[in-house]
Amino acid sequence: MTTFKSFLLLLCISFSLQAYAQEKVTAREVLSLDKGWSFHKGDIPYPVIKGHNATYRNAKAGCVSGAASPNYDDSSWRIVDIPHDWAIEGRVNPDANLSQGYYDRGFGWYRRKFKLSPEDKGKHLELQFDGIATHATIWVNGTVLHRNWCGYTSMYIDITPYATYGDDVNTIAVRVDADAQEGWWYEGAGIYRHTWLVKRSPLHIITDGVFAHPVKKTESQWEIPVEVSLYNSGKLTADGEVEVTLLAPDGQPIATKNQKLSVKALREGIANLPITVTKPLFWSPENPVLYKVKTQVKQNGTVTDEVETKCGFRTIRFDNNTGFWLNGENIKIKGVCSHQDHAGVGVAVPDALWEFRLRKLKEMGVNAYRVAHNPVAKEFMAACDSMGIMVLDENRLFNTSPEYVRQLEWQVRRDRNCPSVILWSVFNEEPMQGTENGVEMVRRMYDVVKKMDPTRPITAAMNGGFFSEYNVSQAVD
């Protein structure tokens, strides 16, 4: 009998390992979730929970009550598409905040339902919000998964453990607190940038996970020290191969590098694949030449994930006496400082409008743009790259606590491949700029940025404190 039980145990283990070894291997899908959100303007109070059984249940994952619950009746809510700014839909209120354009903001709720095919089971599923104004709490299928503390940063939320498949419906609920103000300008209200659902194989490239910024080595030789960050959401160690190919502006391959690696379950792995390039074409405002780095993950000869990252070859240098140098040429920076909102749409700016605005600025002779005073939409950054607008990329919140360091890291990771970015700015006009506390904060933010991108100078937009014994100019480039 003991021998028979041992045989059954080994048989079960064998079947189990076979099931784990056959993990889903598929190509990446990026699906827009912009259409068909249910929207309620105003807050909906959480229900008062009384009694032991109700209180016990309410404390459990997936059992939230009220408007965040999958079972909540939202049939009377209005249907809207994203990007959406509910503040600009209202009327000007003379009693509202001047700095917010005399528009009321307040609270709002969004809900959206979607189904997943049984074929999606085993994939890594990521919910992405490009921007919500301002603070937000996000639930999926009754479990709170994310709290957002900045209206200008993106959210990448792993919903894999919470997803349901087939006929079961998945429910996203978002409570937006737009009374939380971060700036002294019109900030809008709501889910005002795009939303996405990204499906990937268990072994995949993480979002913003390719660093491919060219570095000049000699007069004619350049190197792209490509760094690829991967994650394995599967149940077993995953073996794979990372391949990067540099594509010329006309799409022709220039160079390819490969690296095999093994990533344990629920761990990250990094592949480093430096590519050498001779005499590339330079990126500039007059001729914004863009190359592409195509990154593929292969398993058993099959491409399981792929992303293309645009990059540009250019050198930058600032000199105390002569000013700014781009590609060895002394040029004048003719820039503007502008916020993201636009007449009629508020902060829910259509993608085509970014290019329209930049085109008008170029017609005026502008070659540079300071984002005021926060990370902008990724579509705007892509337009600056392709249209030849140099960017001073500025952080929103001056704070070195863990949450705000995470926001700064996100910004650098997303934008560090952009040839348009010539400077990082860690703050704008902060009262602590002429104090020892301010210096210590900037020192730490400077270190965060330099570790992630050693190629660009770091500044801060001071408007005072220049002659204080301690001032932040001592801690930046």
Segments from the language model and where they lie:
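Signal that preferentially marks extracellular ectodomain short beta-strand elements
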Residues: 157-163, 272-288
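Extended carbohydrate-recognition surfaces in non-catalytic/accessory domains of CAZymes
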Residues: 22-128, 182, 188-191, 203
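Bacterial Sec-dependent N-terminal signal peptides
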Residues: 1-24
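Short acidic/polar inter-strand loop motif in beta-rich domains
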Residues: 44-46, 177-183, 282, 298-304, ...
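N-terminal carbohydrate-binding accessory modules
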Residues: 24-28, 209-211, 294-363
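Beta-strand-rich binding/interaction modules
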Residues: 140, 221-262, 269-273, 293-295
